[in-house]
Structure formats: C-alpha cells, structure tokens
Amino acid sequence: MAIITIDRVISHLLSKQTIAGLDLGTKTIGIAISDISLTFSNPRPVIQRKKFTLDALKLIKIFDHENVGVAIIGLPINMDGSNGPRVQATRTFVSNIAMYTKIPFIFWDERLSTIAAQRHLLEIDVSRIKRENRIDSAAAAFILQGALDRIQILRQNHTEG
C-alpha cells in the first residue's frame, strides 16, 4: 500500500476500476464509490465501526466488490490548517490497513465536507433520523466528488498539454 498524490491516480487505475471515498469517523466509516468514468460519486451504506480488524475486512470486501483501485480518505485538518488528533488517527488507520490491501490511498482535505453534506441533506428534506444514518456517507461522497473534479481538471490539462 502506498500513499500517492491526486496527480498519480490515473496511472494507478486499471481499466474499469473505481475510486472509493472514505470519511473516517469514530463510530462509522462513510463510503462513496465513483462510477467507472470517474465522474460521479455515489454514497454507499456506512460501516458501523467495531474493531479495527473487522472494520478493515469489511472495507476490503467492499473494495473488492466495487473494483476499487484507489481510495481517497478525508483528512480532518483543523480550520486553521493545523493537524489535530483526528489527523493522526486517520494516518494511523491508513498505515494499519496496509496489512490488508495494496490499494493506494490519497489523503484529501475534508474541511467543511460534513457541513456541506448536512446542508445538502437538509435541502432535500431528509428527516433528522435519516440524516444521522447518512451523514458520513454523504460526507464521503463530497470528499470523493472533490477529488473526481480535480482528476477531471488534471485529465483536461494532460490532453491539452
């Protein structure tokens, strides 16, 4: 498993592979999966966190089922740009999951992704109880969509250059 940068995504993907977006919480792991054209992110059901090994195995099973070639994981940087304890927890999670997969990971600044997801769910009139169950996957979809949009720009620049 490697940590790569967004500009190296395309070189790591095989034909028809997708990209996963992850929002790592203390109780759940929000998941979103791209389409094969790497244009749209689609939220998936969250993983209810139990023990690291069980969480990792569930995640790897999803990666295999969804033909994931790269994973984008939200990095919860503080609003002032500093790294808090959640940043270290996320980095440790990625380091530990290396025992289970060779899929490369990209850290992606997730500032305001949960707020954006909450606003979106409110705008489409999702009830409070359903919002609680969907917020982490909606945040994962926002994280992934930001990365997919960046990949599209990089692709355009590559074909124009």
Curated annotation (Swiss-Prot):
Gene Ontology CC terms, in alphabetical order: cytosol
Keyword GTP-binding: no
Matches recorded under SMART domains: YqgFc
Localization per Swiss-Prot or TrEMBL: Cytoplasm
Pfam families xrefs: RuvX
Keyword Calcium listed: no
GO biological-process terms attached to the record: rRNA 5'-end processing
Superkingdom classification of source: Bacteria
NCBIfam families the UniProt entry points to: RNAse_H_YqgF
Task of the protein: Could be a nuclease involved in processing of the 5'-end of pre-16S rRNA.
Name listed for the protein in its UniProt record: Putative pre-16S rRNA nuclease
Organism: Bartonella bacilliformis (strain ATCC 35685 / KC583 / Herrer 020/F12,63)
